[in-house]
UniProtKB/Swiss-Prot annotation:
The keyword rRNA-binding applies. GO terms for molecular function: rRNA binding; structural constituent of ribosome. The gene is rplF. GO terms for cellular component: cytosolic large ribosomal subunit. Keywords: Ribonucleoprotein, Ribosomal protein, RNA-binding, rRNA-binding. This is Large ribosomal subunit protein uL6. Part of the 50S ribosomal subunit.
Amino acid sequence: MSRVANNPVQLPSGVQVDLKGSDLSVKGSKGAMSLSVHSSVAVVQEDNVLTFAAKDGAKSSKAMAGTVRSLVNNMVTGVSVGFEKKLQLVGVGYRTKVTGNVLNLTLGFSHPVDYVLPEGVTAETPTQTEIVLKCSDKQLLGQVAAEIRAFRPPEPYKGKGVRYADENVRRKEAKKK
């Protein structure tokens, strides 16, 4: 069984945590986030350390304590350091550029694809075939990256498409006569 909840969350300098009832809010240099803590989880703040425990001994409560601990740890990391994801465009003529909060993608369709970035997510294009997404919310960042990748997922024969920078695309051999 996982023991994630046993590890306390260290609060770096510059991060403030407010715990009011079951609502926990975290503020830092990169923004503010809030979370509604499950009723079966007890959160205790001592100095710069947050500890999590299940209120009862039920298996589901222990699991929820670990889940809440991971969510809060991601919030603390997000508001202090932030998260980033890199995407690569592989294919002839595939390119991208950022105009304001709109990502313009040319992915081999008969029309360009315009993706409006949600609030809190920023995009940079170091080259025409790379996208760097930055956000303080890990879940939102992953969702945005998955939506962009879904426009043209990498295909297994030539590897063309939008892929994560660390993604390994399994290649297939073409059918031979």
